[in-house]
């Protein structure tokens, strides 16, 4: 028989965990693979002035990106804690926001708009704290992590699914 005190304490600790914010591109979905498919060669090899107009022409680019390897496992883990999506949208692509929303609905089965935050990159740091309590950001872009931490949040620089999961477990997520 379970000890009521231990069950109560475990629930109290789990309820007090920081809110998780998870990036999309290169954390959940494979932007670079999709871009290479669209451009015909790796994204960094195409001139900046040429690559974005080509990507923007494809109205379904964002919604048809593939999962990153292992990312379904990461999403399954963080989704147990009602994780939020915090992703930057492309300012010059009117398909970016609706495409990311469709991707989330179709792939992550996420329909709660209150858990989806599609913002300008520099606005991500504004979600670092809630009521003077730090939140967690999982993001592949180190600049975002540094800005997040400077605002008081807990940053997890996403290098692989296993390292991100290990960092979350160190914070008390099971």
PLM region spans:
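Catalytic phosphate/metal-binding cores of nucleic-acid and nucleotide-processing enzymes, i.e., regions
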Residues: 13-174
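Proteolytic processing junctions in secreted/extracellular precursors
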Residues: 2-15
């Amino acid at each position: 028989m379970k000890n009521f005190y231990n069950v109560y304490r475990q629930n109290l600790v789990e309820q007090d965990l920081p809110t998780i914010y998870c990036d999309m591109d290169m954390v959940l979905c494979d932007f670079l693979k999709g871009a290479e498919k669209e451009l015909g060669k790796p994204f960094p090899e195409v001139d900046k002035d040429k690559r974005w107009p080509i990507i923007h022409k494809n109205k379904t680019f964002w919604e048809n990106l593939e999962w990153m390897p292992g990312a379904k496992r990461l999403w399954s883990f963080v989704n147990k804690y009602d994780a939020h999506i915090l992703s930057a949208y492309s300012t010059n692509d009117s398909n970016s926001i609706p495409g990311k929303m469709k991707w989330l609905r179709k792939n992550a089965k996420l329909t709660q708009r209150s858990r989806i935050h599609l913002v300008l990159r520099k606005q991500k740091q504004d979600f670092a704290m809630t009521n003077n309590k730090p939140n967690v950001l999982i993001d592949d872009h180190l600049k975002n992590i540094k800005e997040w931490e400077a605002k008081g949040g807990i940053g997890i620089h996403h290098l692989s699914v296993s390292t991100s999961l290990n960092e979350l477990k160190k914070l008390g997520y099971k």
